[in-house]
Curated annotation (Swiss-Prot):
PANTHER family, alphabetized: SHORT-CHAIN DEHYDROGENASE REDUCTASE, SHORT-CHAIN DEHYDROGENASE REDUCTASE 3B
Record-linked InterPro entries: NAD(P)-bd_dom_sf, SDR_fam
Domain of life: Eukaryota
Keyword terms of this UniProt record: Oxidoreductase
Signal peptide: none
Amino-acid positions noted as binding NAD(+) in the UniProt annotation, renumbered to this chain: 12-36
Entry's Gene Ontology molecular function annotations: oxidoreductase activity
Organism in which the protein naturally occurs: Arabidopsis thaliana
Binding site for substrate: S144
Name this polypeptide is given: Short-chain dehydrogenase reductase 3b
A Pfam entry, by short name: adh_short_C2
Coiled coil start-end: none
EC number: 1.1.1.-
Family: Belongs to the short-chain dehydrogenases/reductases (SDR) family.
Amino acid sequence: MSGKRLDGKIVIITGGASGIGAESVRLFTEHGARVVIVDVQDELGQNVAVSIGEDKASYYHCDVTNETEVENAVKFTVEKYGKLDVLFSNAGVIEPFVSILDLNLNELDRTIAINLRGTAAFIKHAARAMVEKGIRGSIVCTTSVAAEIAGTAPHGYTTSKHGLLGLIKSASGGLGKYGIRVNGVAPFGVATPLVCNGFKMEPNVVEQNTSASANLKGIVLKARHVAEAALFLASDESAYVSGQNLAVDGGYSVVKP
């Protein structure tokens, strides 16, 4: 489909300062959206907004584990632009790989607080804003192949993403009567700062590892591929799609369950 697929849409992207989030900010604004970048990485987030143009993107500091800050981020967006059409809840963390015998419960709590509870808070307040304005909006959440397959990521991360998939399904059921869609986008291993730092690997090593275990050969998974899937779910092209988890994994989760 040609043309600007989010023309006139107002979007919040959490975790928008780097990685998949930053790539999505760029792609969404290319397609006509005005985006509020939500993150705790202030310098990076502000730099992304400036590089795109502050008429198209703005930055708002928000810790997703703090519900008051989440509510304020949504209020900021609605006050600035008059509405909210799309939430791309992408903020997340990944803890170190350890045996379940050595599981650090503090790390587990932090991962779940950001990846799952933070997303729940944003869905709650974004949906409220959409309902109040009569917006038939779209909510997209970054899940993972780890949302359905164990053994590909640390225990806390895997647990949080399994829970997030349940939240997506539950929220889609509760928000359908308002015309609000809720979906997930589930990438395989992308060489983002989050993954590289979490696994202590250089980007080329992450890509080599992903390509070696991938089902689909001859292509390297990039953040742009995930952003393009999120764009589809955010746009009206997916107008009758809700409660789904769109895998961007080259068939990995199908052939290696």
